[in-house]
């Protein structure tokens, strides 16, 4: 996450890193270039651009804005739910850290390192990546067979939760913890499982592909045809206004694609 000072409006106006502009700049440059060429050819009487009725573009733009707002709302809800789930993961990990002081210091350290390993494995699962976990090898107290099973497991983060659950059961049977303490710690483990299930649901249920493609194509068609509608009335101001309108629509389209994947 990029943290910036939002109190400085001037700096925010000219921000580049972390904005949507680098993503849409190629398409935006093509639209502005097309508008400039169109204005130049028309002013030199080399070419008379076909006039597209503005009322048609007005209605088209309103409809397109409504559908873009629907898509952006749906994508933002996915992003916000992902943030809430990860916040729940952080809060639950802190609860485990606080409530696990009833365990011996060694068992508590193993438990907390496994919770940390679970978070890292879940992150890698959601981002479809594999980061090295050598840091945890001597800290999570897994046997060689357990490590082999971990790397071969289709859901490594779930495997870690199962190992935590088994250790808590052993601690209960040996009398290290009471059944009340076990239930409290187990509830936190259940909450971690719920977080993973929620993240998996978001990851495996994207917005309908056909819906995204339809809006994507419509936005680009609208932006590339727009100069033909505005050139007759705006003249040399056409590239500027077309660039601003295209930046708005192309930016909203690209922004919704980023929000659709809340896990980076």
Question: What kind of feature is each model-predicted range?
Answer:
Residues 26-48, 53-57, 67-71, 201-264:
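Alpha-helical transmembrane anchor segments
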Residues 97-209:
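Structured inter-helical modules in multipass membrane proteins
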Residues 2-13, 53, 138-144, 217, ...:
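Conserved catalytic-core motifs characterized by acidic clusters
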């Amino acid at each position: 996450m990029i943290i910036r000072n939002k109190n400085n409006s001037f700096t925010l106006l000219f921000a580049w890193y972390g904005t949507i502009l680098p993503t849409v700049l190629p398409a935006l440059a093509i639209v502005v270039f097309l508008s400039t060429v169109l204005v130049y050819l028309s002013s030199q009487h080399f070419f008379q651009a076909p006039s597209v009725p503005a009322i048609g573009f007005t209605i088209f733009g309103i409809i397109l804005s409504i559908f873009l707002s629907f898509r952006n709302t749906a994508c933002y809800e996915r992003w916000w739910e992902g943030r809430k789930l990860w916040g729940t993961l952080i809060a639950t990990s802190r609860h485990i850290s606080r409530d696990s002081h009833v365990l011996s210091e060694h068992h508590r350290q193993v438990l907390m390192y496994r919770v940390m390993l679970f978070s890292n494995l879940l992150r890698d699962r959601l981002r479809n990546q594999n980061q090295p976990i050598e840091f945890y090898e001597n800290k999570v107290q897994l046997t060689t067979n357990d490590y082999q099973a971990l790397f071969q497991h289709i859901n490594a983060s779930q495997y870690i939760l199962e190992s935590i659950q088994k250790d808590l059961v052993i601690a209960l049977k040996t009398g290290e913890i009471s059944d009340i303490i076990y239930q409290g710690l187990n509830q936190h483990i259940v909450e971690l499982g719920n977080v993973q299930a929620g993240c998996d649901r978001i990851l495996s249920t994207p917005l309908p592909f056909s819906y995204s493609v339809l809006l994507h194509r419509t936005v680009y068609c609208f932006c590339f045809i727009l100069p033909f509608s505005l050139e007759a009335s705006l003249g040399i101001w056409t590239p500027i206004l077309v660039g601003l309108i295209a930046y708005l629509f192309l930016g909203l389209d690209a922004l919704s694609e980023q929000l659709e994947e809340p896990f980076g």
